[in-house]
Amino acid sequence: MTNNKGSIYRQMEELFRFILTNVEQSKLSTKNKVQIREEIIGLQSFVIGARPARIAIVGRRGAGKSSLINAIFGEQKAEIGDYKSQTGSGKWYLFENELGGIEILDTRGLGESHLPEEQAATANPIEEVKQSVKQKCPDVLLFLCKGKEVGARIDEDLQQLLQLKQDIYAMHAYNVPIVGIVTQVDELAPASNSEPPFTHPKKQENIQATVRILEGKLTEVVTTPVTVIPISAYVEYDLGEIIYDRRWNIDLLLDYLITELPKEAQVILAKLSKVKSVQKKLSRNIAKSVMAVTGLIGATPVPIADMPIITGLQISMIGTIAMISGDKLNRKSIMQFIGAMGINVGMGVALREVSRQLVKVFPGAGNFISGSIASAGTYALSEAAIIYFIDKKSQAEAKKVYLDKLDKARNKEQ
């Protein structure tokens, strides 16, 4: 991903430097400057520091590791070993498409009775994984267990999982989160209800029973509550196209994973998900962060001289939402959106200069801008950007949302 960063990323970096410089030169209090600087650096990590999520997947042979990778992408990225353990030595693999990638720590199947088709370098699966963990720290550990096997011989696997968690902390001082995943719930009884969303009462009862069992076992071993998500990842492909799709709860898993990941790993996974609800949730979380900054700046009336801080942050927010949507992040798409809101800025102007020009047309611009209006403008822009980039609505529809949200905020001010 880093190699693909071009001029737009340089402009975004310049924009963030411009914002931070304006913060330092502003008449804001020292306390506020420190808080605002921390928020801005956090926001910067979403775009400038964006990288693939690093996910370690642990589970026995046949637990569905490769199927899960394919289900996340909606493409056949990992080979599935039907009879022998397909996974070789524990090492990092980058699975990617045009939207981005995920780094997967590919573990040998725990408890396997056959050698993997990719010959492992050492005999102990957990030792192989430890070698890779030394190289890169996983963002999250996924513990996969088949629905039919949650009560069968997984205690040893759980102890190895705990050891891995402890090793990660010892190596990286990182308390890695664990997510339990019950796989292949479509195969639970009754077999007659094998299609999502599995509404049969007995099916749901069996699914929830497996979740409770795995929750109990994981919590007992790692001594802290662990979220467990039941899924079905079964998909059939022909010539690269999906011809049968039995995926269930993959969107729920992705939504939860994003909340557990570091900021720099969230945007690319949201892009890859292609799930609008996931993309919107992350976009709104980012918008809330920007609103917090604009509200803090406007705790007292904001001098026009300090306004480029607010408008600069709003531009960075728009660019981040565009990136989350899966659109190629470029200056043109940001400028087209700004133009759609009725704000005319020269197309050849650098983003940092755009933030200066936006001050002239900012809602309510006078000698001072109140914090509530600044936050309202940020909120209105974020909702319009979500409509435009994620929902793929027209410029007219996005502008209507922007004006409606802004009018409601103005009415509250009166």
What are these regions (language model features)?
Residues 2-112, 319, 328, 383:
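Conserved G1/Walker A P-loop phosphate-binding module
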Residues 31-36, 42, 54, 233-295:
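C-terminal-of-GTPase-core extension/linker across diverse P-loop GTPases
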Residues 109-120, 191, 241:
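AAA+ P-loop NTPase catalytic core and its hallmark functional loops
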Residues 110-112, 147-152, 186-189:
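Short acidic, S/G/P-rich loop/turn micro-motifs used as interaction or catalytic elements
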Residues 115-150, 157, 162-174:
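Inter-motif core of Ras-like GTPase G domains
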Residues 176-177, 185-265:
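Canonical P-loop GTPase G-domain recognition
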Residues 286-324, 328-379:
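Membrane-inserting effector segments that mediate pore formation, membrane fusion
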Residues 382-414:
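Hydrophobic alpha-helical transmembrane segments of membrane transport and translocation systems
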